[in-house]
Amino acid sequence: MAAYLLAVAILFCIQGWPSGTVQGQAMPFMEVYTRSACQTRETLVSILEEHPHEISHLFKPSCVTVLRCGGCCSDESLTCTSTGKRSVGREIMRVDPHKETSKIEVMQFTEHTDCECRPQSASG
């Protein structure tokens, strides 16, 4: 039995482990296709880019995760676009460097709920 296990281990070392189990192994086509499709996905957004009027404060963390549309469409003339949005709250530490104070508070961010491939605008 030990000789068989050794032979199997050597074979895997030569040919590679079964799909997806070894770093560098190719991801199967259907998984690549599914992951790349137009859909909501967790995205990091900068607090200052989302709330540019807050430049006098520092934030910890400086970015948050929200769901945003992203991915590929089946036709290059289409773009992955949000068709539904909602406001979500995230607890953030707001630091006022001038007053040397900080407090935890809830800030609102736009999160996408639905996505669709739509024709690209003439300006984009």
Swiss-Prot record:
Signal peptide from the UniProt entry: 1-24
Gene Ontology MF terms: chemoattractant activity; growth factor activity; toxin activity; vascular endothelial growth factor receptor binding
Domain of life: Eukaryota
Pfam families on file: PDGF
Cited InterPro entries: Cystine-knot_cytokine, PD_growth_factor_CS, PDGF/VEGF_dom, PDGF/VEGF_growth_factor
Sorted UniProt keywords: Disulfide bond, Growth factor, Pyrrolidone carboxylic acid, Secreted, Signal, Toxin
Tissue note: Expressed by the venom gland.
Disulfide bridge partners, by residue number: 38-80, 69-115, 73-117
GO cellular component, as recorded: extracellular space; membrane
The UniProt record lists the keyword NAD: no
GO biological process, one term: sprouting angiogenesis
PROSITE patterns for this protein: PDGF_1, PDGF_2
Residues modified as Pyrrolidone carboxylic acid: 25
Compartments (UniProt record): Secreted
Family listed: Belongs to the PDGF/VEGF growth factor family. Snake venom VEGF subfamily.
The protein's role, per its UniProt record: Snake venom VEGFs that may contribute to venom dispersion and prey subjugation by inducing vascular permeability and hypotension. This protein induces an increase in capillary permeability after intradermal injection, as well as a drastic hypotensive effect after intravenous injection. The hypotension is mediated by nitric oxide (NO), which is produced by VEGF-activated endothelium NO synthase. Also induces angiogenesis in vitro. Like other crotalid VEGFs, this protein interacts with VEGF receptor-1 (FLT1) with a high affinity, whereas it binds to VEGF receptor-2 (KDR) with a low affinity.
Quaternary state and interactors: Homodimer; disulfide-linked. Interacts with VEGF receptor-1 (FLT1) with a high affinity, whereas it binds to VEGF receptor-2 (KDR) with a low affinity. Does not bind VEGF receptor-3 (FLT4).
Protein name: Snake venom vascular endothelial growth factor toxin apiscin
